[in-house]
Curated annotation (Swiss-Prot):
Catalytic activity, EC: 2.7.2.11
This protein's GO CC annotations: cytosol
InterPro entries: AceGlu_kinase-like_sf, Asp/Glu/Uridylate_kinase, G5K_ProB, Glu/AcGlu_kinase, Glu_5kinase, Glu_5kinase/COase_Synthase, Glutamate_5-kinase_CS, PUA
Biological processes, Gene Ontology terms: L-proline biosynthetic process
Catalytic reaction list: L-glutamate + ATP = L-glutamyl 5-phosphate + ADP
Pathway this chain belongs to: Amino-acid biosynthesis; L-proline biosynthesis; L-glutamate 5-semialdehyde from L-glutamate: step 1/2
Domain PUA: 274-345
Keyword hit for Protease: no
Residues at which ATP binds: K7, T166, D167, T209, G210, G211, M212, T213, T214, K215
Compartments it resides in: Cytoplasm
Protein name: Glutamate 5-kinase
Amino acid sequence: MSLWVVKVGTSLLRGNEKQSTAEVIESYSACLSASLKRGDHVVLVTSGAVGLGCNRLGLSQRPVDVVALQGTAAIGQGQLMALYEAAMSRRGHTVAQVLLTRSDLGSRQRYRNASSTLKQLLDWGVLPVVNENDALSPEELRYGDNDTLSALVATAVEADQLIMLTDVDRLYSSDPRINASAEPISDVYHPHELTALEVAAGEGGAWGTGGMTTKLAAARIATASGITVLLADGRDPQVLDGLLQGRRSGTVFHPHPQPLGNRKSWLAHALKPLGTLQLDEGACDALQHRGASLLLVGVKEVEGNFEANQPVRLINPEGNELARGLCSLSSKELREAIETQMSTNRSPVVVHRDVLVLRNA
């Protein structure tokens, strides 16, 4: 028995001249049903609410205004669930709607509640259908077409594998739709490879278009938690059917050999940093090579405004992110402490190692 998280993006659910959105969902549902009947557990993370809402209102263009986007999402979400409910119930399955926001997963208690609820639904043999709560999300629908959400959900339920379906057949060194010499990438083994790909994406190279950058970020989150990530072609439902039966397709992102525990993964990925601490070389070395806590003496600059025990980024002198953690002092207290530390021998702990996660840990 395997525990799968399957993510279906907006581009695949728009429909085309060959298939309507309802027919696309019907095809995916047949694959998911077969997996459930084999005894697997499956969580579906799906986009598509805004598009269906636009269709219902007769809008030819996706709204730009945030309130209009939230309104179309509210209209479309009911239609989206109705399509999945109809397709799965015809095959004898029950579905459950789970709507999440970044603030839900950023609260440790609500994260644990979401995890427990999803696991209970899976124990009952139910198919949880997860989407961002676009109608209420204060982050202006910026989760990244649910890529990041799917990785956080996979971590929360401790999935074996995350399947991200997209409109290309695998990862390439550059966009194959505009570069005929783009090279296919079948395997990504190490966080350093992910880092190189993310840099290339930022420069318009690998995954620089079509929302691929967010898929790289999602792969980093999931693989750091010990989850295998499969990026594959979602235009052909038979690809999904094969993946759910263990056949290989697309690009495989292999899990980190020393995965983060659930709490550390939450610290590293579910929280949105509210500030940044720039460290000196000595502090960077202590964190990276000695497993130390961050002491006040190692903090050179403080950016942003935050309260005590809120998340911050830790960067090296070159400005590269080294780690994330919960700062024991508020930004105001920390700035004052930095100014006065020359007159005292005390160097209190700013981020304890128990609530600190290295970027490539």
